Curated annotation (Swiss-Prot):
Name of this chain's protein: Cysteine desulfurase IscS
Positions of [2Fe-2S] cluster binding: C328
Record pathway: Cofactor biosynthesis; iron-sulfur cluster biosynthesis
Binding residues annotated for pyridoxal 5'-phosphate, in chain numbering: A75, T76, N155, Q183, S203, S204, H205, T243
Annotated GO biological process: [2Fe-2S] cluster assembly
Superkingdom of this protein's organism: Bacteria
Taxonomy of the source species: Bacteria, Pseudomonadati, Pseudomonadota, Gammaproteobacteria, Pasteurellales
Family from the record: Belongs to the class-V pyridoxal-phosphate-dependent aminotransferase family. NifS/IscS subfamily.
UniProt-listed Enzyme Commission number(s): 2.8.1.7
Catalytic activity: (sulfur carrier)-H + L-cysteine = (sulfur carrier)-SH + L-alanine
A single GO molecular function term of this UniProt record: pyridoxal phosphate binding
Gene3D superfamilies: Aspartate Aminotransferase, domain 1, Type I PLP-dependent aspartate aminotransferase-like (Major domain)
Function: Master enzyme that delivers sulfur to a number of partners involved in Fe-S cluster assembly, tRNA modification or cofactor biosynthesis. Catalyzes the removal of elemental sulfur atoms from cysteine to produce alanine. Functions as a sulfur delivery protein for Fe-S cluster synthesis onto IscU, an Fe-S scaffold assembly protein, as well as other S acceptor proteins.
Enzyme class of the recorded protein, top EC level: transferase
Length: 404
């Protein structure tokens, strides 16, 4: 076993060796290096063919038509294109947008920007388990709600929303439905032929492909229209201009192909490892799982260890790569807004650790992690006066702390 151990797959994944090998054939003079938009010679045709193959591989994983796949620089851009693009195109029909407080910042900040432009956004609160109450969602839909944006799997707590039911509510209200599937694609069965999803954001690096490339699914029937946010040569049917990065797109396609082939065996393996981790940690006193365990990604475990500071716990776990909060926001010392939205107090939100498992995670690594965690929590609690008070039976919520 090699240290440090990587248990932060929700932040990014290593590129699969098979993907890296394939990408190498699309870079140098000996490879397929042409511009897919060069229609007048073989170099361009070969590059275009490679892009077409990748487009099909991505569509195959999600039950879509390859003509519904638009390449972007990543899921953040896909979220921006979907939300701004739909809002701007359909604004004559209404200016109300519906989303949830636990969405990724790429969705929330895009909605904030639209608010500055005069759109009205409703931010739903999830239930304590992280799931959206469908009745509350339905009640929040209005005749002028042109767009709803709800993520499939949450990046921090791994909770899976019922996008089938939410999609049907949106369809009945003639509301465009965007799903951020960055964390779920390739980990959960998604068949867009059976879902009323109009727009879906995807990433490559969350599924063992390269960073810097992603895709947006844009439904053709019933047709969804977008206003572009990047203008230029009219690539990607005018929705996203810019020369296509063939090597990255080929890498993403190969990563999605591998995921489709291996999903049936890989997800039960990860679930067994995740449950092993959970069973090893749940006996530690005052530990709480964040988010529903029933409706959750098999690879995610988010636990709060009461009376332990999350940051100090991470420092004590130098040999294990985990995160508190999401990678995009974990540089700030604010408690996770996702956990706060579930109703956790600051202390519990601050003491949370997210473990996310992946393709290279082994049983040996999980057992090592359990032992290290137990020791670290015990050691840090031994230093905590709050833990002593709790053990003495003092209710810490009743104490009036005075500033001095």
């Amino acid at each position: 076993m090699k240290l440090p151990i990587y248990l932060d797959y929700a932040a990014t994944c290593p590129v699969d060796e098979r993907v890296a090998k394939k990408m190498m054939a699309f870079l140098t003079i000996d490879g397929t290096f042409g511009n897919p938009a060069s229609r007048s010679h073989k170099f361009g045709w070969q590059a275009e063919e490679a892009v077409d193959i990748a487009r099909n591989q991505i569509a195959d994983l999600i039950g879509a038509d390859s003509r519904e796949i638009v390449f972007t620089s990543g899921a953040t851009e896909s979220d921006n294109l979907a939300i701004k693009g739909a809002a701007h195109f359909y604004q004559t029909k209404g200016k109300h947008i519906l989303t949830c407080k636990t969405e990724h910042k790429a969705v929330l900040d895009t909605c904030r920007q639209l608010e500055r432009e005069g759109f009205e956004v409703t931010y739903l609160s999830p239930e304590a388990d992280g799931l959206i109450d469908l009745e509350k969602f339905k009640a929040a839909l209005r005749p002028d709600t042109i767009l709803a944006s709800i993520m499939h799997a949450n990046n921090e707590i791994g909770v899976l929303q019922d996008i089938k039911a939410i999609g049907e509510l949106c369809r009945a209200n003639k509301t465009i439905f965007h799903v951020d599937a960055t964390q779920s694609v390739g980990k959960v069965e998604i068949n867009l032929e059976e879902l009323a999803v109009d727009l879906m954001s995807m990433s490559s690096h969350k599924l063992y492909g390269p960073k810097g490339v992603g895709a947006l699914y844009v439904r053709r029937k019933p047709r969804v229209r977008l206003e572009a946010i990047i203008h230029g040569g009219g690539h990607e049917r005018g929705m996203r201009s810019g020369t296509l990065p063939v090597h990255q797109i080929v890498g993403m396609g190969e990563a999605y192909r591998i995921a489709k082939e291996e999903m049936a065996s890989e997800m039960p393996r990860l679930k067994a490892l995740r449950d092993r981790l959970y069973n090893g940690l749940k006996d530690i006193e005052e530990t709480y799982v964040n988010g529903s365990m029933e409706h959750r990604l098999d690879s995610n475990l988010n636990i709060s260890f009461n009376y332990v500071e999350g940051e100090s716990l991470m420092m004590a776990l130098r040999d294990i790569a985990v995160s508190s909060g999401s990678a995009c926001t974990s540089a700030s010392l604010e408690p996770s807004y996702v956990l706060r939205a579930l109703g956790l107090n600051d202390e519990l939100a601050h003491s949370s650790i997210r473990f996310t498992l992946g393709r290279y995670t082994t049983e040996e690594e999980i057992d090592y992690t359990i032992n290290l965690m137990k020791g670290a929590v015990e050691k840090l609690r031994a230093l905590s006066p709050l833990w002593d008070m709790f053990k003495e039976g003092i209710d810490l919520n009743t104490i009036e702390w005075s500033a001095h």
